[in-house]
Amino acid sequence: MIYFRNCLLFLFLANSIVSFGQSQSIVLDWTGTERVLLGEEPFDVQTVKGFGLDNGQPFFAIQQKHSSIDQEVEIVNTLYEKIPKEQQLIYQQLGLVPADNAQIDAKIVSEGGLPIFSCYILPLRSVNGSLERLISLDYRFLAKNNQQTKDYAASSVLGSTSGKWYRIAVNKDGIYKIDKAFLEDCGINTTNLNPAHIHVYGNGEGVIPEWNGASITDDIAQNAIVVIGEADGTFDANDFILFYGWGAHRWELSGGNQYNQVRHPYSDQSYYYIYVGSDIAPLRIAQAAVIDAPADTLVSTYEYRDVYENDLENLVKGGQRWYGEEFDVNLSQNFNFTIPNVSPVPVRFQVSYASNSRTAGNQISLKNGTELIGQMVLPHSGSYYQRGTLLCADSTPSSSQSLNITINRLNPSVVTYLDRILINAQRELILTGSQLNFRVSKWSSTSNLASYQLGSVNANAFVWDVSDRHNPVRIPLTLQGNQATFKALAQYRELVVASGVSFFTPEKVGSITFQNLHQLPLADYLIVSHPDFFTEANRLADLHRANGLTVHVVQPQAIYNEFSSGMQDPGAIRRFVKMFYDRALLNDPAAKPKY
């Protein structure tokens, strides 16, 4: 098949500073090429000159010094051209399916305290079944609303002393049930407990992005829930709460309606909070209005995604990248997947790995059963370990996928490690098990209103639209036998159908004490200390206070509670510190932290 080189080259214009009000242009020169293999046959893929392929797609990237961090980028005047027919055929053979528009990520970032204009482009797009490529665009800079982008809660909800807080954990996306026994196991007294006083908080946003300007929820958000049996004002034995919990690992949609999992490198669990108190208004899941208009699109399948990944080996003994199975003594290994009710549409596999192959001739091959579906030469640039990605498809899918990965090596010193296997497929909308998450991202340009058809449902089944992760909405169903239909606008949305019979159960973590880091005043010195060293950290703080400095001493878990919804994440500590910087810059720049 093809070796996708996983290198990323940035063009950095060190002496060029672009200022507010100026309009600039980017022109993409499509005279570059990169040689790839389909089986044993080489092909030259056209790329942007000076750049190659990133995860199988042509790309362009640029960085420039900029005049101000407090600006945002507007892209205008994008110009495309049709890709030559012979190149379109190569892209099709590679299984490349671009999005409807080029993906342009343009922003102002801070590097070493200096503002940098950064732009990364995946320049291909699909138009009515034909491929086009971006050849130029203009960009300009606009003033950014600092108050909006640097807004922090004045006080954390965890500072509410009118009730009690309890932390719980979830392992995957889905609908979770909290019953009376679970509440009591958490230490909550359910005698005379009014269900209107039970609230669920949590963000479910996965790992905090490394980019400082990324938009994420500040503090922790209240989640809409369902409380069965709350009408009588007491929490009885048969009463229970339903909420939608998001796991630690998130999925994102990439080009060609394919999904990629963004793995949380520090946690396999996501955390939520139960708050019991009368000072907060209850937030309940609302029901959407019935849509009477006729649908123009029928939906009976959805986009299925799965991933296989084991964290067993860290090749550089540091960093976030871990690998799984080793291909050395055992050069041929099988991986089995089950895709119930798979549609007769090619199943796409993306196999990522690392190998220390230093010479040509070593190969990785992929079989589904006995059929060879992908093959490529291992990367051999001479570096210690190099990453590679094999992208292929099985055109005759079945519910049972038996994937065989084999390394054919000429030298016994060549060792390969599997990173992960990503699967993208189409499944029939048939409920298997207690609940099913589903979504559709690819729509016809003529689609406006969709009618979804669900199979194998019962009279207790229901559907939630969870596109707003904190405020799910219940969608009315029309039931007929074991079939159900509902209507929704033809646009990307995350949905879940549940049998109404059984649900996932969260894991108890424990109660937490009141805290309010958001309410801390500005300080000269910030100390983050593990509990084991907290006494000594406070001694150090007292020493600096005696010298006239204002000091805060904080434990990491307290920061995680307010800045990463309870998950261990170094990005939360960065955001905690950044809160003091941002508040000072808006009010008194001289008051920003110094240590």
Sequence positions of predicted segments:
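Bacterial Sec-dependent N-terminal signal peptides
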Residues: 1-25
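Extracellular pro-sequences of secreted precursors
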Residues: 22-550, 556-559, 569-593
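Outer-membrane beta-barrel proteins
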Residues: 564-565
